[in-house]
Amino acid sequence: MAQFDLTRINCQYLDRHLTFPLLEFLCGKEIYNQQELLEYILETVNKTNMIDYTMDTRKRLNLSQEMPEELVQRKAEVLATLKQLQNEVAPIMKATDILKNGESMKDSKTFVNALQKDYNFKVEHLESAYKLAKYLYECGNYQESTSYLYFCLIVMSPNDKNYLNVLWGKLAAEILTLNWNTALEDLTRLRDYIDSANFSTIQALQQRTWLIHWSVLVFFNHPKGRDLIIEMFLYKPLYLNAIQTMCPHIMRYLATAVVINRTRRNALKDLIKVIQQESYTYRDPITEFLECLYVNFDFEGARLKLHECQTVILNDFFIVACLNEFVEDARLMIFETFCRIHQCITISMLADKLNMKPNEAECWIVNLIRNARLNAKIDSKLGHVVMGTQPLSPYQQLVEKIDSLSMRSEHLAGLIERKSKQKNQESIDSWKYY
């Protein structure tokens, strides 16, 4: 279903190395021409120093079984440059080992003092460590690259010209080595830096747009990610504004997170508002499923869209692992919404709405009532499900109010900050005439 594939647009906001898992994932699907896809991978990998990956891709394209002279020469150059950079960093190699093993060295001042005292540390060493980290990353040696990037983060001043690049590089390397806990820490650190940095409005918007795309990789792989993606994308006005302005297609991932997160059903109301606002710029089966169900109360439409959702998710690298969960929770949403409207429902009617056989639907409803403690009874003889009232718990009411107040407070804080910056700028401009 190339119509709803977001790989092309997502790759525009990802580092070159982060696109490879997405492209390799597509190779296992039948969405695009395999030859053209492999040619694009080869074109992309040629811009890196991953010679072995380049050779492997050439073999898959049946170009050659032997390494061309050009690649042999490039590999020799890469190894020579790598050795040269490692020699430049040699004086602080032991220091990076201490940093990896010693928790006490995580304090920046302590570590820098130890470097200067014990290793005769100089500014040139920091520049060499940065260059080596970047080069290792370009070679695909992400694990080793993280050690030097971490070293740079500890030693560098946030005002250093390379500090922002190190933050982005560290996050990318942790994602590519599947270190999700560390990746989340790096994501938070980078977000805090972007939010507090003195960027222009356009620069800040661009930085947040890139961060939004990178963060999707982290959020759908971290245990706490399903809550964090909702908080960041839906309840942080600066990031919601970036989504609405630059990348409304991210609504797919926000909507998916809300559907599979049963503890955050309170976010549905706010999500539906945003989906309706952005429906003229972006729609897909996932957002349309929620519109059918919660705006139009079109259960037949929701049933058809749920079927389309399965195909979309199956072909989306970011959320493919959520497929079974999404289908289960989407059925639950249909069931809950249908039950709010009808007090007495036939099992055959529910089975039709849920794309299930009557026997399967009855077992599913029995388990649902037992596990979710829904106030309902099943009359097997008549084939009816009789619903009781399901009041909103005080906890859910409290969470809804807190989220609403938090969003309003952050919006007001952003408004005050923008007015303050504008006032300061006017004051600075007025001095130009004296």
Curated annotation (Swiss-Prot):
GO terms for molecular function: translation initiation factor activity. Component of the eukaryotic translation initiation factor 3 (eIF-3) complex, which is involved in protein synthesis of a specialized repertoire of mRNAs and, together with other initiation factors, stimulates binding of mRNA and methionyl-tRNAi to the 40S ribosome. The eIF-3 complex specifically targets and initiates translation of a subset of mRNAs involved in cell proliferation. Keywords: Cytoplasm, Initiation factor, Protein biosynthesis. One of its GO terms (biological process) is formation of cytoplasmic translation initiation complex. SMART domains: eIF3_N, PINT. PANTHER family: EUKARYOTIC TRANSLATION INITIATION FACTOR 3 SUBUNIT E (PTHR10317). Residues 219-392 form the PCI domain. Its main location: cytoplasm. SUPFAM superfamilies: Winged helix' DNA-binding domain. This is Eukaryotic translation initiation factor 3 subunit E. Belongs to the eIF-3 subunit E family. It comes from the Eukaryota. It is found in: Cytoplasm. GO terms for cellular component: eukaryotic 43S preinitiation complex; eukaryotic 48S preinitiation complex; eukaryotic translation initiation factor 3 complex, eIF3e; intracellular membrane-bounded organelle.
